[in-house]
């Protein structure tokens, strides 16, 4: 492995580490990573001098946000993604509601069925969208100035055979 790929490796390691920290730290309402699946899916691959960052599919939506069908969070205004005709399936929120310990009650004080709660959450997300967290974008952009000199030096050393 050349100096260029070593520098890319350091850069990619830093970005993934910071993205995982952002997921664990979360935001105003707690962790963005209740199950740990997204965090454990974050990785990178270096191939022919290019870095590819990998994650579960929904990582993109959590990072960039999704515009809602009726309204949009200010953080998600620039998102390329938007709910138009279909709601997210309510079943995907089942494990999340259990781990979150959410157990709301109706007007008579009875617990709402989990299936109904999952539907209400899915409908709210469909209407309002998903707030952009920038858990990956921020470390990706912040790391460039930190590692650009190392990456450039590594590239020049590997390709121009510079002697010091």
Please report, for each region that a protein language model flagged, where it lies by residue.
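Charged, low-complexity interaction tracts
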Residues: 37-164
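Charge-rich, low-complexity N-terminal segments
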Residues: 1-45
């Amino acid at each position: 492995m050349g100096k260029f790929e070593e520098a890319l490796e350091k850069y990619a390691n830093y970005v993934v580490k910071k993205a995982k920290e952002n997921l664990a730290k979360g935001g105003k309402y707690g962790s963005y990573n209740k199950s740990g699946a997204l965090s454990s899916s974050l990785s990178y691959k270096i191939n022919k001098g290019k870095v590819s960052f990998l994650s579960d599919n929904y990582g993109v939506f959590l990072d960039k946000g999704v515009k809602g069908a009726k309204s949009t969070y200010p953080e998600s205004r620039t998102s390329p993604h938007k709910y138009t005709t279909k709601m997210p399936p309510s079943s995907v929120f089942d494990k999340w509601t259990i781990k979150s310990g959410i157990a709301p009650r109706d007007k008579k004080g009875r617990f709402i069925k989990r299936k109904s709660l999952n539907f209400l959450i899915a409908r709210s997300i469909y209407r309002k969208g998903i707030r952009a967290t920038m858990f990956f974008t921020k470390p990706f952009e912040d790391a460039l100035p930190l590692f650009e000199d190392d990456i450039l030096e590594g590239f020049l050393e590997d390709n121009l055979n510079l002697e010091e």
